[in-house]
Amino acid sequence: MTLRLHDSRTQSLRDFVPLVDGRVGIYVCGPTVQSAPHIGHLRSALAYDQLRRWLAYRGLDVTLVRNVTDIDDKVIDNARRGQEAGGTEEWWALAYRVELEFSRAYAALGILPPSYEPRATASIGEMQAIIGRLVERGHAYPADDGSGDVYFDTASWPEYGELTRQRAADMEAAADADPRAKRDVRDFALWKGAKPGEPASASWPSPWGAGRPGWHIECSAMSTRYLGAEFDIHGGGLDLRFPHHENELAQSRAAGDPFARYWLHNGLVAVAGQKMSKSLGNSLFAADLLASARPVVVRYFLGSAHYRSTLEFHDGALAEAEAALDRIETFLDRSARRLAGTRFQAEPAATDGAPAAVPDEFAEAMDDDLSVPQALAVLHDAVRAGNAALDAGDLQEAASLRADVSAMVAVLGIDPLADEWRTASDQPARRALQALVEHRIAERQTAREARDFALADRIRQELAEAGITIEDSPGGSHWSIDGE
């Protein structure tokens, strides 16, 4: 089956055909590092991590660029407010501190590092070059009030609105700059002239005067700098579709770049049925989320909904994810113990880097616009079938299903047995539990051999009360947690 992705520009499912055979270039709008990361940031980054992993599984060489917006009105304003409250942190220090918070949160969730992670402040020259081309082509104009602002002339670009299918007359005024010298209220800032009272370190020299770039031009410059004038996929949150992505597309095309061939947008997060927002006071910060559950559980939850749908967070959401992941983990543990020492023992992972094959139904789901919910259904069906095979003593079938489950969780990045999810505290606890349970099982076996069935039954009952299930078979006794 051919991979199909929902292209926001055409509002349709399209067969994915890379610009260069065997290679994929992806640009994802990263965070504006003004304040601590929240669940919405994590959900977006994880959606494109799933896409990247699936493309890599299909044998494509993926270059993923995720930017850091480290210069912006919000960054400057937050630093100023901190200083007014008695702090000393400069805007650039705030941006770097918050950037590290994002990096730690991404790493905790197993989100693969991007191929490139450029900061906006490192591409000022590329931004000015695009602005210069737009001015030369008649699609941008310097303000005539001496402010140093440069605006994109929306009236000069008839295709403006093509991404969101809006008519120019229906669009709202651009809210990213003062309207002091705009020709049209929809025109947006490409370059913002320095204002009195702003830190000198937040301005760069330019042909139009000292200032800093507008938000939209930053992504146009960084994407084409690292991926070229035309690249495969541009991704980001649904809330960026307008005006940010609409403006990116317009200014890039007007400057002569073909730009992105596919546009993907992930859905937002709702908390107790309400859209998450600072104004409602219902933001869920990454640090709190990661403190409330194991990171792999958080990753499972964030990636369990279709990437284009709204992700609903409620009080029991993480508990449900924990239960689902526990079913996977206990099957993998149980099957590993049952198969150990048999001819069906799990083989070590291939050393040539080739991923293990996933079931056809799983691949079909992922090829259908990354239908992760359907892929997870295939995964859990395999877990149930694997447990049934173990119950029936069919080790060959159990081994086959274990291989399927292992391949699927590896592709999704949620293998609960992977070293990356084993914390320093997990390892000793697991070893201690295993030693204690196996010691009691050995005592039970000794009692059975001595025909002391009362003691053997008492040991079984004690373990059952602790959530340990014992299964007796001709090959010996095996144990599992919580009714594996």
UniProtKB/Swiss-Prot annotation:
SUPFAM superfamilies: Anticodon-binding domain of a subclass of class I aminoacyl-tRNA synthetases, Nucleotidylyl transferase. The keyword Protein biosynthesis applies. Binds 1 zinc ion per subunit. GO terms for molecular function: ATP binding; cysteine-tRNA ligase activity; zinc ion binding. SMART domains: DALR_2. Gene3D superfamilies: Cysteine-tRNA ligase, C-terminal anti-codon recognition domain, HUPs. This is Cysteine--tRNA ligase. Monomer. The gene is cysS. Its EC number is 6.1.1.16. The keyword Membrane does not apply.
